[in-house]
């Protein structure tokens, strides 16, 4: 038995990773015949995709020559390689001549490039699989959950590279086809003006047409204004109206507290009574009804891990998306609690990376991503304390990346004798594809809930 295992190990060590030297040769030879093919080829492959080291060196040298404005041919390429002492490493002049000679046409060069790329991806999968296996043998103190996150993020990085070639400029005909198809879909599907995810708030829907897929939505407010409550209400409404899951990342509050708020909101039961357990029969009946609905739908996921990194949020969101064949909404509370260890010494760059990743996630999964944000204390010094975009903490990247920015303002927080008690202003500070303005909602703090405002709204 031991001998058989040893034999298999030896066989595995002799395995040659998948590659196609013929396809690599055809790509390089084709580029020497027709330099104009470089742009299309470079959309498909990079130097590291070549299995043969001489081929990698040749491709790199071709790129350098083109960057300097020189043509690629047998003479220029061999001369450049010789000056750098690399000609011997690639097989000398005779091998370059063979590449050029054995490539009769460039007609299928992109197909050959695809073959090179496909083999490279499979090799990378093998490499990543080995790294994952090694991580399992040598955990370095990491728990199984951390190892799973590492494995998942490693595989998804390969997937990102795999689909990168689908990006880039599109002809107007293709974009028009996609646009007309979207318009026709909206025309044929009754939606009462809501083209995105229904917020559950009539006046807010009129302003935004719902929370649009692929958009990054920032909700910001000073403490005690109710930003977590508002964001949770949006998640609750989405969970009740749609079947696909809502994913909540709560970096600040434990999942149990989130659920208590949710039960109070959906059951219309005073959250103080829920927290203290002082419930009457009617309260229990309401809560039981809500629990039954939540268990029937089973479409809310809460991750209360602290200090998550953008890559962890992305990998976990992808996992839930994949397991459920889609998502309705993602919410992060709040983004300043996320961390990027490699950028920890520069908070501005750290927030920029977090913002960029969340925007990319929304676009990748085609779902709205809501991120809660803090506001600068400086607004407290103003007479009018209604927030504006510049009040966003580390505002530059957030304001730039966000498609929709909503601020919450409740006058009663600052003015004890305010005649606007129980009224919240949802201030739309930015909307990339719609108007800005203000919508009023009723704030029922004892239920941890914002509701539609029955009085007259204003713009």
Swiss-Prot record:
GO cellular component: a single term: cytosol
UniProt-listed SMART domains: AAA
Taxonomy, superkingdom: Bacteria
Pfam family, one: DnaB
InterPro entries xref list: AAA+_ATPase, DNA_heli_DnaB-like_N_sf, DNA_helicase_DnaB, DNA_helicase_DnaB-like_C, DNA_helicase_DnaB-like_N, DNA_helicase_N/primase_C, P-loop_NTPase
Keyword Transmembrane part of the UniProt annotation: no
EC number(s) given by UniProt: 5.6.2.3
Residues annotated for ATP binding in this entry: 221-228
Subunit-level organization: Homohexamer.
The family this protein is said to belong to: Belongs to the helicase family. DnaB subfamily.
Function noted in UniProt: The main replicative DNA helicase, it participates in initiation and elongation during chromosome replication. Travels ahead of the DNA replisome, separating dsDNA into templates for DNA synthesis. A processive ATP-dependent 5'-3' DNA helicase it has DNA-dependent ATPase activity.
PANTHER family documented for this protein: REPLICATIVE DNA HELICASE, REPLICATIVE DNA HELICASE DNAB
The protein, known as: Replicative DNA helicase DnaB
Native source species: Buchnera aphidicola subsp. Acyrthosiphon pisum (strain APS)
